[in-house]
Regions:
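Multi-pass membrane proteins that catalyze or facilitate reactions on polyprenyl-/lipid-phosphate substrates
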Residues: 1-277
Length: 277
C-alpha cells in the first residue's frame, strides 16, 4: 500500500465511521477499487484514529461522564446510589451508555465467526445491507422528532439504541445510521439521537481496537509511514464528519444519505453479480 492509497482509505474510514453510510461496506468497496488489502496494523490504527476523533470532539462530556461514573461507584459503597443517579444526568448517561453497549458486546462474543464469514464473502452481501441502511434512514426521516433528550432519556431508549448498534455488526449496515434511526423511532430528539449515537460508538470502536491490538505484534508493517498517514487522515475526517452530522441533522433531512446508500448498494450489488467487481 502506498501513501496515497493509505490517505484515501483513512479518509473513507473517518468519514463513513460517523456518516450514516456504513464504514464496513465502504472499506470493502474502496480496497477492491484500489486493488489493495490493508494489514492488521493499518486497520488497527484506522480504528484508533476514529476513536480519538470522537473522544476529542466530545471530550468535555466524556470527562464529566467518567468523573460522575466514578462518583456513582462511591455512591454504591455509601448506600446513596439511587439519589445520586437521579440527581446527576451525567451519572445516568454513563450507566445508560454501558447498558446500551451490552447487546453489541454479546453479539461480538457469540457471533464473531459468523460475522467474519460475511465480511470475507462476495461484495453483494455488504451491498445488500447498504441498501437496507438506506431504507432504514429513509423511513426514520418520516418520523416526527421526539422530545426525549439528555435529561430525560431512560433505560428503555438506551437499550433500544444498543440493539440498533448490535444489528449494525452486519457488513453494510451503518452503525450511526441504525442507532440514530433507532433513537428517532423510540422518541429521541434528533440532535440528541446523533450525540448518543456518536458517544455510544466509543466502547464499540474501543472494543474493536483492543481485539486487533492484541494480535498486532508480528503483523506490524516495516513501512510505518502509510499507517501514520492513514491514522491522521481517519482522525481528521472523523472529526469533520461528526461536526457536519450534528449540524446537518438539526437543519436538514438525512434523505440524501438514504439515496446515496441505495445508489451505491444497487451499483455494487449488480456489479458483484455480473463479476465486474
Amino acid at each position: 500500500m502506498n501513501i496515497i492509497q493509505a490517505i484515501i482509505i483513512g479518509v473513507v474510514q473517518g468519514l463513513t465511521e460517523f456518516l450514516p453510510v456504513s464504514s464496513s461496506a465502504h472499506l470493502v468497496f474502496i480496497q477492491n477499487i484500489l486493488g489493495v488489502e490493508s494489514s492488521l496494523a493499518f486497520d488497527t490504527f484506522l480504528h484508533l484514529g476514529s476513536l480519538l476523533a470522537v473522544l476529542w470532539f466530545f471530550r468535555a462530556d466524556i470527562i464529566k461522564m467518567i468523573v460522575s461514573w466514578i462518583s456513582s461507584l462511591s455512591d454504591i459503597v455509601h448506600g446513596r446510589f439511587k439519589e445520586g443517579f437521579h440527581e446527576d444526568p451525567y451519572k445516568r448517561f454513563a450507566w445508560y451508555v454501558i447498558l446500551a453497549t451490552i447487546p453489541v458486546g454479546l453479539v461480538g462474543v457469540f457471533f464473531e465467526d459468523s460475522v467474519d464469514a460475511l465480511f470475507s464473502g462476495a461484495l453483494y452481501v455488504p451491498a445488500f445491507f447498504l441498501f437496507v441502511t438506506g431504507t432504514i434512514l429513509y423511513l426514520s426521516q418520516r418520523m416526527t422528532s421526539g422530545n426525549i433528550n439528555f435529561h430525560n432519556v431512560g433505560p428503555k431508549e438506551s437499550l433500544f439504541m444498543g440493539l440498533g448498534q448490535a444489528c449494525a455488526i452486519l457488513p453494510g449496515l451503518s452503525r450511526s445510521g441504525t442507532t440514530i434511526a433507532a433513537g428517532l423511532v423510540i422518541g429521541l430528539d434528533k440532535e440528541f439521537a446523533a450525540k448518543f449515537s456518536f458517544i455510544l460508538s466509543i466502547p464499540a470502536i474501543l472494543g474493536a481496537f483492543l481485539l486487533q491490538v492484541k494480535d498486532i505484534g508480528s503483523a506490524m508493517d516495516a513501512n510505518f509511514l502509510p499507517i501514520i498517514l492513514g491514522f491522521i487522515a481517519a482522525f481528521i475526517a472523523g472529526y469533520a464528519a461528526i461536526k457536519w452530522m450534528l449540524e446537518l441533522i438539526q437543519k436538514r433531512s438525512l434523505d440524501i444519505f438514504a439515496y446515496y446508500c441505495w445508489a451505491v448498494g444497487i451499483i455494487v450489488f449488480m456489479g458483484s453479480i455480473a463479476h465486474i467487481f
